[in-house]
Amino acid sequence: MESAEPAGQARAAATKLSEAVGAALQEPRRQRRLVLVIVCVALLLDNMLYMVIVPIVPDYIAHMRGGGEGPTRTPEVWEPTLPLPTPANASAYTANTSASPTAAWPAGSALRPRYPTESEDVKIGVLFASKAILQLLVNPLSGPFIDRMSYDVPLLIGLGVMFASTVLFAFAEDYATLFAARSLQGLGSAFADTSGIAMIADKYPEEPERSRALGVALAFISFGSLVAPPFGGILYEFAGKRVPFLVLAAVSLFDALLLLAVAKPFSAAARARANLPVGTPIHRLMLDPYIAVVAGALTTCNIPLAFLEPTIATWMKHTMAASEWEMGMAWLPAFVPHVLGVYLTVRLAARYPHLQWLYGALGLAVIGASSCIVPACRSFAPLVVSLCGLCFGIALVDTALLPTLAFLVDVRHVSVYGSVYAIADISYSVAYALGPIVAGHIVHSLGFEQLSLGMGLANLLYAPVLLLLRNVGLLTRSRSERDVLLDEPPQGLYDAVRLRERPVSGQDGEPRSPPGPFDACEDDYNYYYTRS
């Protein structure tokens, strides 16, 4: 009996704790914050999986070559070709073919990728670009799917696909499997990234809170791109290739379970919430001139990042005789100005929300100036300053224009955000699909200086285009046709007849029949019209 009492008390305590947690999960403000945490973790995972292979894949492909049909070299000496990631948006990496092997790597060098042969260089470039390419192809389909299914189910699908991709990475034994895993990640990102950002825009409809929430999401993207390569390199060195991917797979599974607990995407209430208004088709959104201007700015601002990353390490070695440590550390300090840019834009947007276009234009100008300054740097410190300016400008553009897309949908279309953020994801994917494949060829044919100056000039020329958005803040929120019709008084031969409210089971004790297929639609209307 004495032993039964503590067991009963433990069960009672567990029941009370479960009820308290359940009540907390259903409280609207806490639920909204938990949704933000879930989305931020999903974005963090996507970027960590994107970057964690940077120190692993070149060495892994070289290991495959050593045991396969490819040529072998003795001693095993390579140069680093994939720089450490930038703290801005998820980026693509590729090796550069112009360097030659020099000194042997010291022990414990898994944090720095080995230099592959020329044929492997092409393989790595295609491998890194495959994610963005598939994401680019899937987004025109995932956007309308998200509009139709609401946001939680596509986010759950994206997390599930990312989990499968991560596990496939862990057990990949050949290039074809690596390519399949990388492409599968692009499929998951097309659902998880787009639905996650759209969910934030939907949960935070008011502008100051929306900008702040999207800024937090961008900070998680930045942190994920920064921490993933050292995370992957350390675990790869001391625990093996599979461990970093299995850790990320476990976090992805936990995030999916948390989403199931918080959003309950398959419950009856979730199905009722999913009965959203019909969203504007994605092709019509693409033809909206304001949305087209924003999408062009997002692509333009990310081109310098996507094109400099695969090429700047070799340029540093040839221009300033940079050491391996300097090449690896070049992007690391840029994390601070990127987060600072996000914070500054959020604060300014809260105080002057009608000047979002100006913050984006200033960001493009900073990116253009920084990109033009890069070729003039002849030492490590000025180069770091210019790269910090580049990431600061990208933070200004992203933080200012992502909320602007949601606002444009609110005031000019239907407030359903899947398709518009699919357009934003397409804008990013264009830059990162081209960067790993064509950046090296441009450098070899035209030169690094011409590449940097061209990208800087493109950003400087695009900055005045954002003047077209200067009147966006003066627009008023539109109302859907359904809302207008419901608010109009009956006219002519029609009288308004109020529907009898039906009792709900559990509220008055009376049973009710099972809901029919059209009950959710009927509940949306308070009145119907009938001929008098």
Swiss-Prot record:
GO terms for biological process: acetylcholine uptake; chemical synaptic transmission; neurotransmitter transport; positive regulation of acetylcholine secretion, neurotransmission; positive regulation of long-term synaptic potentiation; positive regulation of neuromuscular junction development; serotonin uptake. Optimum pH is 7. It is a multi-pass membrane protein. It comes from the Eukaryota. One of its GO terms (molecular function) is acetylcholine:proton antiporter activity. Belongs to the major facilitator superfamily. Vesicular transporter family. This is Vesicular acetylcholine transporter. It comes from Homo sapiens (Human). The gene is SLC18A3.
